[in-house]
């Protein structure tokens, strides 16, 4: 039943993306508890990691939030609110040979240098060009450095991709362009084993937080986002 509902959710999301104005919610979405994380007009609701403001490199144009890597006011950005059990939807596209990511359960503290020190990441990357995409578990839609997907469903660079991330009492699922990429249970012995076999073993608090902020990563490349919405479960 859960798989059916998730598949139906993604189908509806795809229809809505085509039929409605970007960065808006339908009456049905509002009734179901969805909220916009990006209003299509400003960077309101976002701030740089461990800061209270957002840098000038994150800009809005024609309803799209994007990172301008030429602007010195850069850095990862996070939601103002923390989330625990949720479904997140958004669309992204990345520049040729570009790299970025969506990180959840991020803990802000002066003891951490970056959001990826604590939160697991859904990889955003140009699979066809970026050298990191040659590495197993580092391709678009993967749970970065932890779990690879057997099914590649990413669009070419500079084309839009649809994402659904579901995190519900430790049950984590990633969907990319209607194809499930990852399904795992966090906060289990198996989860800890994944961490121990990854680069994150050097960060003792990685993957431990059961709630946190949602982060859009600055990885030195041009990346665009739109239709960012969330529903708490």
Give short role names for the model-derived ranges.
Residues 1-21:
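Bacterial Sec-dependent N-terminal signal peptides
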Residues 20-233:
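Carbohydrate-interacting regions of secretory-pathway proteins
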């Amino acid at each position: 039943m859960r798989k059916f509902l998730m598949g139906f959710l993604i189908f509806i999301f795809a229809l809505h993306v085509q039929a409605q104005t970007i960065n808006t919610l339908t009456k049905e979405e509002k009734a179901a508890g969805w909220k916009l994380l990006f209003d299509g007009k400003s960077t309101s609701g976002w701030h740089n990691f461990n800061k209270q403001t957002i840098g000038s490199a994150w800009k809005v144009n024609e309803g799209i939030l994007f990172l301008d890597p030429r602007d010195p006011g850069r850095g990862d950005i996070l939601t103002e609110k923390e989330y625990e059990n949720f479904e997140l939807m958004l669309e992204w596209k990345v520049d040729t040979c570009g790299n970025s990511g969506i990180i959840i359960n991020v803990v802000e503290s002066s003891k951490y240098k970056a959001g990826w020190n604590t939160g697991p990441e859904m990889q955003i990357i140009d699979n066809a060009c970026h050298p990191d995409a040659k590495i197993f578990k580092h391709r678009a839609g993967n749970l970065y450095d932890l779990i690879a997907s057997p099914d590649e469903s990413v669009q070419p660079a500079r084309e839009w991709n649809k994402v659904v991330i579901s995190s519900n009492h430790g049950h984590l699922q990633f969907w990319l362009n209607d194809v499930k990429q990852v399904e795992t249970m966090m906060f289990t012995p198996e989860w800890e084993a994944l961490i121990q076999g990854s680069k994150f073993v050097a960060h003792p608090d990685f993957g431990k937080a059961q709630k946190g902020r949602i982060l859009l990563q600055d990885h030195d490349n041009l990346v665009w986002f739109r239709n960012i919405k969330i529903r708490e479960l």
